[in-house]
């Protein structure tokens, strides 16, 4: 019976199309899944989409669509992207799948019935893009510590998960399982986070309805992280009659995630599993970001690289190779067109492509395209053979540590050694001496056999290139398995045939100029597209008024909020504004400012705010909008 291996990616949030950073995670998971299949494992590879939440509901409403209609379109694009990227997932889960929703409700009910979930009132800060709740002390400059975007103050009745009860258990688990969180730096971050004190987690929302209903209280929907994290077990049939896959594959061997969501996967998710009495995943690996000059790629910032465009231009294997080779998997890396092109030219065109081309060309030229029989091996041959024979074990060791870059570096040592072997043995010189024909045959056989090893070992990283290599070398399927990685199995008499160049060289200067021009055009188009025009009728719905600040005081418990009493004509209003880091209460009194007069009141830290003041912000600065002449409070602005 085969050993099992269960690997997952995060399920991606389909608020917009995905970028190369998402492909990075998924290509890495795919390479690992393919490698484990190659080495004889029964693999389960899961990916999918996390489709609920307030942000999706807002975007869909803006586009005049239902949330389900909106995500359906994005999901089709994502599935097409994974097809383009040669992703060999075994199951694609959507959190809108009926079976997932049903199991999530069962999980919520179980946790509620055993006392791990209870009803209460939440008051704090909420980041809509991240779907995350934060305390005042966790904010960085008053913004979300994960994404750096503004947060909203919310007061809401709902359900809480007793996360605080699991802090000591989590720390003990980390101590007993030192490899659970990788790399080591992420582990230390999580230990420090827990030691600072865990607060109970708000796990339902009632201010929007795009989500899975709390089964016994349907005006609440289940908080997106409880919903999303459960996918790793709902996809296997947990809590159903058909739970064979769950029994077979759980616990997961590795959750691959971006470093920004390690906290959810190593604190919230394990605590949930402990509460459910289930074993924890064996490893959570939080990889770094692919960064463009100027910062992390982000759909909301618009500074993303479209993987489909890259594949159209350079081919899928070149992109997969670059992603896995360029940056050590746990670290951040910078994506640039120049680095990509140089990597293609150097490693793929010059090293691998030339090795195949030279080998096949020489076999055709000197042996009419028929692989010769090797004769006795000399010391220089044994050196090449040893590099090849020792390679599978080294690659396996690196892959088990998720060190994709190091695994590829090892494979390229054989590529380099084989190229050097050509220069050392000089087949073109041997061909001139008939008495050296046997020696020439040995050299060319060793090169072809080295290429067979290379093709097998790069297949998890670059699924298409080995097929082209094997076709040119005449290698049959039985000699492309892990078990066939024994030097000397390639059959003499095999017919080779030159094919297309694996990776044509790219003119770096011309290509960069072309890409720069294309980027400029795209940026111009994007800027034009991003103006979200409204009609005069839309604007006329907003009532702006001049208001005079009569009183101002800090809101207790917040360094950001100021409560102000305003005179708006004959009316006195109260507004709460997040301007405490830029203005003292004293300097506000007497100012005439602009407010949104007809905004629906809402509570901030339990204090009702009857409108919203207007301010300009830029690069950490803020300035209130005021009037340049003395005018009566209550005056309308049009």
Curated annotation (Swiss-Prot):
Residues 538-638 form the tRNA-binding domain. GO terms for cellular component: cytoplasm. Keywords: Aminoacyl-tRNA synthetase, ATP-binding, Cytoplasm, Ligase, Metal-binding, Nucleotide-binding, Protein biosynthesis, RNA-binding, tRNA-binding, Zinc. It catalyses: tRNA(Met) + L-methionine + ATP = L-methionyl-tRNA(Met) + AMP + diphosphate. The keyword RNA-binding applies. ATP binds at residue 299. It is found in: Cytoplasm. GO terms for molecular function: ATP binding; metal ion binding; methionine-tRNA ligase activity; tRNA binding. A motif ('KMSKS' region) lies at residues 296-300. A motif ('HIGH' region) lies at residues 12-22. Its main location: cytoplasm. Its cofactor is Zn(2+). It comes from the Bacteria. Is required not only for elongation of protein synthesis but also for the initiation of all mRNA translation through initiator tRNA(fMet) aminoacylation. This is Methionine--tRNA ligase.
